[in-house]
From Swiss-Prot:
One of its GO terms (cellular component) is nucleus. Plays a role in very early embryogenesis, gastrulation, and the development and subdivision of the diencephalon and the midbrain. Establishes and positions the zona limitans intrathalamica (ZLI) in the diencephalon. May play a role in the organizer function. Probably acts redundantly with otx2 in early brain development. Embryonic expression is highly dynamic. Detected along the marginal zone of symmetric embryos at 5 hours of development and found at the shield, a primary morphological asymmetry at 6 hours of development. With the extension of the body axis, expression extends to neuroectodermal regions fated to become fore- and mid-brain; found in two stripes at the posterior side of the eye rudiments at 12 hours of development, distributed in the diencephalon, midbrain and the epiphysis at 18 hours of development, and found in the diencephalon and the midbrain at 24 hours of development. It comes from Danio rerio. This is Homeobox protein OTX1 A.
Length: 338
């Protein structure tokens, strides 16, 4: 109330003044400076006093007036202080008993095993199923492994002729070599073109290439056979069985100067890149070797794209690096990286 009157902004001089202000104005007038009851000074007990009080408390918690007066005379304190000390000592004793009882109730609860823990056997019961190999890569390995006899007559043996697909890269991209001999007029496009024509035939592409039962070597002057041992040592980070990357493989492994020398399916020039292309299929065991002096690529396998599996393989060819075929259905093809 006093602070409210002091803070009142509208109080006139002499009207809104409180008690403390009036004392300053009229120091001779005796106003009560502290209206509250005077608090008793806190009693501090010495060690000897506490020992005497504790000894009496050990005898009885509720001493009578005579005991309290006797102890008050010993410790030189009024009897009321002794009475208050006993009252506080009893309250302290009750508080300690309550804490001990609550602690005894909490301790057995902590010792109980937590139900959230599971036995270690339950975690091992779940079996981890490895991801299934894509149907395209498995069919690639099976088709290439089905006819190893057809591959034996040629120097280029596919690295994945065994049952398991070996990491390799399909690196045919923009190859436009010397046209094929007259005896094989339909094989004038390179291996990538024939593979892509077969892929396009399944998706409504341009033309389908008939299967040739015997392997052939195109352009004997460039044909070089590489053994199987170093086939897996070149570019072993990607698998041809799951996707085709004719454009992308060229962009990564050849300088951009070669892009100007690309040719389409209509005009196949005499220029060729130093590719080493091995193509093995279950129905088309063709092998072509374009072996130059620069960069040998690992022989890789490509599937028979007349199968229905080819409909799930989608390629996306950039217009800057288009070669070998007229891709009429570019929107439907998508390049998929595993």
């Amino acid at each position: 109330m006093m602070s409210y009157l002091k803070q009142a902004p509208y109080a006139m001089n002499g009207l809104g003044l409180g008690g403390a202000t009036m004392d300053l104005l009229h120091p001779s007038v005796g106003y009560p400076t502290n209206p509250r009851k005077q608090r008793r000074e806190r009693t501090t007990f010495t060690r000897t006093q506490l020992d005497i009080l504790e000894s009496l408390f050990a005898k009885t918690r509720y001493p009578d007036i005579f005991m309290r007066e006797e102890v008050a005379l010993k410790i030189n304190l009024p009897e009321s202080r002794v009475q208050v000390w006993f009252k506080n000592r009893r309250a302290k004793c009750r508080q300690q008993q309550q804490q001990s009882s609550t602690n005894s109730k909490i301790r057995p609860a902590k010792k109980k095993p937590s139900p959230s823990r599971e036995s270690p056997g339950s975690e091992s019961s779940g079996h981890f199923t490895p991801p299934a190999v894509s149907s395209s890569s498995s069919s690639s390995s099976s088709s290439s492994g089905s006819n190893p006899s057809a591959l034996s007559g040629v120097g280029l043996i596919s690295s994945s002729s065994s049952g398991t697909p070996v990491p390799s890269i399909w690196s045919p991209a923009p190859v436009s070599p010397v046209p094929a001999p007259p005896s094989l007029p339909d094989i004038s496009p390179p291996a990538s073109a024939s593979c892509m024509q077969r892929a396009m035939s399944s998706g409504g592409g341009t033309t389908g290439v008939p299967s040739y039962p015997m392997p052939y070597n195109q352009a004997p002057s460039y044909a070089q056979g590489y053994p199987t041992s170093n086939a897996a040592s070149y570019f072993g980070g990607m698998d041809c069985g799951s996707y085709l990357a004719p454009m992308t493989g060229h962009a990564h492994h050849h300088p951009h100067a070669h892009h100007s020398q690309l040719s389409t399916a209509a005009a196949v020039s005499g220029h060729h890149h130093p590719h080493h292309i091995g193509q093995s299929s279950g129905h088309h065991p063709h092998h072509q070797g374009y072996g130059g002096t620069a960069l040998p690529f690992s022989s890789s396998d490509c599937l028979d794209y007349k199968e229905q599996v080819a409909s799930s393989w989608k390629l996306n060819f950039s217009s800057a690096a288009a070669d070998c075929l007229d891709y009429k259905d570019q929107a439907a093809w998508r390049f998929q990286v595993l």
